[in-house]
């Protein structure tokens, strides 16, 4: 290879490396328990020889399609009479389902479905995917009609579910093959199943107290458990301190190497509160990160919201104010951590992570009226897997608005579509998803040791921020890549949570 060609290849490789920073490996794989039951009418099998076998073939196509989306599928066969429907309930309950697809392979009476609505606690999605895009009218037969009668009983089923007081979560309508829109709906529901699977099994730690006097942070842990299914485990700083006070030297050295391999540590630029990462701040960050990992393993946690100050100059103050690096690594690995005691946003970040779209801790920073953008970011924690390039660590001589000093994380998220969601609380105590879709734009960010991204939201920054604020959000929100309001609306239906997308109908 000539020198010029080699130089070109090297330049391209370097550019790719900068554009695609190393990813933090997920601690646990995404999964969900998804059931599929087909429905039909046993009278047809006697009248139309071969129809039952054709129904099984249709069901098999759909089940394989669901399996392709990273979920564990349990098939319950065809429910074709009231007795068969009732007999399936024990198996469905033992499968611990996160979601049930009801495959409407042909017309079925609602008695083949009603027991599922009455007995199961998971969301139910009706799927009507007919094999032919239309009947061959000149050569049509009753057999062919029944083979394509997937939608026929959908209104009957949805009406009965409403009368039971438990409406179905959704109806997917389309063609069995070659229908990208229907396939996307199925994919989205499997993503929602990932969220539901982990939410209702999660143990989220809660430590300390609300940062004085952020009223919007206050939330009832019982309401969180009732709505999302997760258990809120109450924790204390003294549970982490033994791991910090007596660290394993080899673990700390390995963590320091991991941190330095993952982050850049540039010289300070314009902010006098920042300096190049010091050896002391690296040591403290590594010790705190190791202590955090041992603590969450001991308590068997899946997320952690915290705020604590401790006595000035104490080891406790040093520990609890230096979680930022460790919690960013954990958040990126699928373990959401939320500062300022924001349990609601910890749930929002878990939702985004299980949708596999990131889930950075964020709030609004100054508006850029010249670019028609608003800076979105925070002082930690952050989902490093959605960074636009290698993230930066800076030593901060003090944290603005709170005690302590230490390493701070700085980066912008990837350019392109973004989604954000705040988990708000209404006056009646119920939760509300407040969602927006926008764009992450390239642009300079302040070198302050905090994350910042230029976010542009329609129709313009002033109108968007006013509409967002009037929906009553928590001032924190989860920030992710891609446009995913559709999945969040589905999740809202599954959980019975009001969902408002402020950038819709703009």
Language model regions located:
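Short, acidic/small-residue loops that bind anionic groups at enzyme active sites
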Residues: 115-140, 145-153, 327-340
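Periplasmic-binding protein-like
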Residues: 97-106, 125-127, 301-307
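Short, well-structured alpha-helical segments in soluble
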Residues: 85-97, 114-116, 289-298
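Long, internal scaffold/assembly segments composed of regular secondary structure
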Residues: 256-349, 353-354
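Short catalytic helix/loop segments, enriched in acidic residues and glycine
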Residues: 51-67
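C-terminal catalytic subdomain
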Residues: 328-448
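Cap/lid and interdomain-hinge subdomains that line or gate substrate/regulatory clefts
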Residues: 30-34, 70-73, 133-270
């Amino acid at each position: 290879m000539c020198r010029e060609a080699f130089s070109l290849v090297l330049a391209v490789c370097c550019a790719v490396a900068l554009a695609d920073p190393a990813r933090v490996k997920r601690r646990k794989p995404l999964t969900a328990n998804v059931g599929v039951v087909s429905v039909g009418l046993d009278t047809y099998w006697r009248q139309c020889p071969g129809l039952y076998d054709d129904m099984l073939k249709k069901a098999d196509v759909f089940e394989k399609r669901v399996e392709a989306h990273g979920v564990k599928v349990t098939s319950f066969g065809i429910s074709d009479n009231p007795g068969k429907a009732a007999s399936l309930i024990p198996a469905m309950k033992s499968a611990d389902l996160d979601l049930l697809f009801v495959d409407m392979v042909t017309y079925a009476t609602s008695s083949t479905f009603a027991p599922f609505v009455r007995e199961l606690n998971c969301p139910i999605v009706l799927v009507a995917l007919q094999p032919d895009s239309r009947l061959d009218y000149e050569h049509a037969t009753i057999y062919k009609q029944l083979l394509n009668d997937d939608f026929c009983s959908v209104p009957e089923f949805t009406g009965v579910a409403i009368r039971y007081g438990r409406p179905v979560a959704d109806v997917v309508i389309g063609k069995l093959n070659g229908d990208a829109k229907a396939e996307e709906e199925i994919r989205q529901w499997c993503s929602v199943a990932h969220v539901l699977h982990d939410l209702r099994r999660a143990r989220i730690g809660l430590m300390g107290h609300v940062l004085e006097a952020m009223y919007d942070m206050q939330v009832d842990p019982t309401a969180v458990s009732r709505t999302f299914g997760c258990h809120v485990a109450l924790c204390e700083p003294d549970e982490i301190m033994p791991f910090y006070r007596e660290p394993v030297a080899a673990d700390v050295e390995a963590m320091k190497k991991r941190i330095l391999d993952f982050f850049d540590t540039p010289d300070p630029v314009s902010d006098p509160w920042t300096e190049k990462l010091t050896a002391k701040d690296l040591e403290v960050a590594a010790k705190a990160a190791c202590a955090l990992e041992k603590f969450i393993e001991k308590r068997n946690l899946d997320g952690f919201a915290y705020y604590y100050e401790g006595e000035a100059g104490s080891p406790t103050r040093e520990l609890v104010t230096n979680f930022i690096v460790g919690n960013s690594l954990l958040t990126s690995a699928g373990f959401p951590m939320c500062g300022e005691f924001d349990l609601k946003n910890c749930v929002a970040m878990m939702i985004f992570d299980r949708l596999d779209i990131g889930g950075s801790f964020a709030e609004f920073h100054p508006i850029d009226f010249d670019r028609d953008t608003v800076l979105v970011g925070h002082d930690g924690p952050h989902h490093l897997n959605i960074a636009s390039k290698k993230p930066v660590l800076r030593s901060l001589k003090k944290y603005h608005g709170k005690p302590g000093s230490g390493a701070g994380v700085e980066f912008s998220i990837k350019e392109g579509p973004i989604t954000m969601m705040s988990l708000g609380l209404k006056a009646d105590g119920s939760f509300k998803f407040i969602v927006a879709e926008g764009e992450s734009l390239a642009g300079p960010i302040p070198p302050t040791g905090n994350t910042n991204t230029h976010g542009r939201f329609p129709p313009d920054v002033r109108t968007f921020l006013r509409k967002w604020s009037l929906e009553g959000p928590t001032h924190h929100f989860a920030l992710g890549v891609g446009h995913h309001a559709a999945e969040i609306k589905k999740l809202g239906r599954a959980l019975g949570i009001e969902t408002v997308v402020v950038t819709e109908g703009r």
